[in-house]
Amino acid sequence: MKKKETAWMKRKQLLYTEERKWEYGTILIEDGICLIENGEGDILLADSLQHSPIWIHHKGKWEQAGFQDKLVLACGAENISLSGGERIRYEKSVKRPLMALLDSLDDETFLAFLQHLHSFGLSVFDCVFSYNKGVFSNTSAGQGVSFYHFSNDTAQCAMQHHYNYSSEGTGDRFEWTASNGKRSIMYTAVQRGRK
């Protein structure tokens, strides 16, 4: 059990070293309410990050901080009163269906998947749509297809994950198609049980 937990932690550390893990935003204060406008212009309540680590650009560098009050960030021993316009960043999350897929892959396939995704100029944090049949289906079928779409400012890619884990199954097949016409297929014949 300990070995499995260590491998899981190494995977998470690998994922969270990616630069694309960051969502950048600007603090807005409207009628005493603290809001965050992200880089795409979406607005969210700062309260939604109440229990998440955030970083503020303070004195020329990024420093970890946390909300002490609605309009006050605790940054080390210093309290920063927010007035609007402050730059922050916080970690994006990986969509649950995509994380379930990643968790189900053996180490070799996991690394190959990340390398493939990076070759398209994308990251797991660029996943904007995910449908994992194993997560959303009540059936225990050992075969099916799941769908994922990745997008950022410079690249878009759709990925289909075909799988067959039955006794005569072929394992996993990942079909990638990018908006620039690049296509790729990645196979794995590793047989594994469903988790």
From Swiss-Prot:
InterPro entries: DUF2777. This is Uncharacterized protein YisN. Pfam families: DUF2777 (PF10949). It comes from Bacillus subtilis (strain 168).
